[in-house]
From Swiss-Prot:
One of its GO terms (biological process) is cell morphogenesis. Residues 171-185 have a biased composition (Polar residues). Residues 109-188 are annotated as: Disordered. This is Probable septum site-determining protein MinC. It comes from the Bacteria. InterPro entries: CAP/MinC_C, MinC, MinC_C_sf, MinC_N, Septum_form_inhib_MinC_C. It comes from Bordetella pertussis (strain Tohama I / ATCC BAA-589 / NCTC 13251).
Length: 292
């Protein structure tokens, strides 16, 4: 049959999403945890598709209330992992059951808390979302390339996330290999609060300060030659070898391939306001001093 005459066709696709892991079925506690996580991360995870993982709770989940809480934070659910009565309840609420698989990439954890000190440990398997977000570099970023500085995946991800541990959750499809990097995107002006720069399929180099409230995101590495006081995410589409480098570390949030840490307290004196790198070691986010 000639498919050119058909009004639709079927194509394979890989979807990535944030896995929201429920540790409690109580709606009040879930909403409070969600509010805190989203407040910590700012706009990092807004508009990222999520898969709800309810396999760790036995008590019945109030699915309509949970879906409303996610909607209030612009987190659209695309599927659920659950068992027994909770699975049926999720179906009744309109959610589609999906299977989670462990693979190369990882997606952001919204509910799980990162341990203290200088490491963040994710929960094993996680989904990723893929869609392109709507936050462009601000007016001062006139040196950013039009295609590379357009939209950040942390907001309408091509990675289902979402804006942290990144393990593929596919919608019944194998994981795609991260694209090859091209020339780095270079920004030579400071980034103010509220500005976001995304380097698609490449590294991001910022020569200047990344202010508190600003976000720098790259599919490859992130280099900040100046104070890093905002949020930084390397390996935005699942590259676990990506790293973050800065000459002065004082960040609000750090993430590599979706494994993230909100920096609520000052880092150790050997790291705070010092040259540092951030990398993944297995499933652990490590922050290390850079020594000459």
């Amino acid at each position: 049959m000639n498919t050119e005459s058909l009004a639709l066709d079927f194509k394979s696709a890989t979807l990535y999403a944030i896995r929201v892991v429920l540790h409690d079925a109580d709606t009040t506690r879930l909403r409070a945890a969600l509010d805190k996580r989203m407040a910590d991360a700012g706009s990092f995870f807004e508009n990222e598709p999520v898969v709800i993982d309810a396999t760790r709770v036995d008590a019945p989940v109030d699915w309509p209330a949970l879906l409303q809480a996610l909607a209030d934070h612009n987190l659209p659910p695309i599927g659920v992992v659950a068992e027994g009565a909770n699975l049926q309840g999720a179906r009744d609420a309109g959610l589609v059951p999906v299977e989670l698989s462990t693979s190369v990439a990882r997606a952001p954890q919204v509910i799980d808390t990162a341990p203290p000190n200088d490491v963040a440990t994710p929960v094993p398997s996680v989904p990723e979302a893929t869609a392109e977000a709507t936050a462009k570099a601000g007016p001062q970023d006139d040196e950013a390339d039009g295609e590379q500085a357009d939209e950040a995946p942390a907001h309408n991800p091509e990675s289902v996330p979402t804006r942290a541990a990144r393990e593929t959750t596919e919608a019944n499809r194998p994981t795609a290999t991260p694209p090859q990097s091209s020339s780095a995107l270079v920004i030579t002006k400071p980034l103010r609060s509220g500005q976001r720069v995304y380097a698609r399929h490449t590294d991001l180099i910022v020569i200047g300060m990344v202010s508190q409230g600003a976000e720098v995101i790259a599919d490859g590495n992130v280099h900040v030659y100046g104070p890093l006081r905002g949020k930084a995410m390397a390996g935005a589409r699942g590259d676990t070898s990506a790293r973050i480098f800065t000459t002065q570390l004082d960040a609000e949030l750090l993430a590599v391939a979706g494994v993230y840490r909100v920096v609520e307290d000052k880092l150790d004196r050997a790291l705070h306001n010092q040259p540092a790198l951030v990398r993944l070691d297995g499933d652990t986010l490590r922050i290390e001093a850079l020594k000459g």
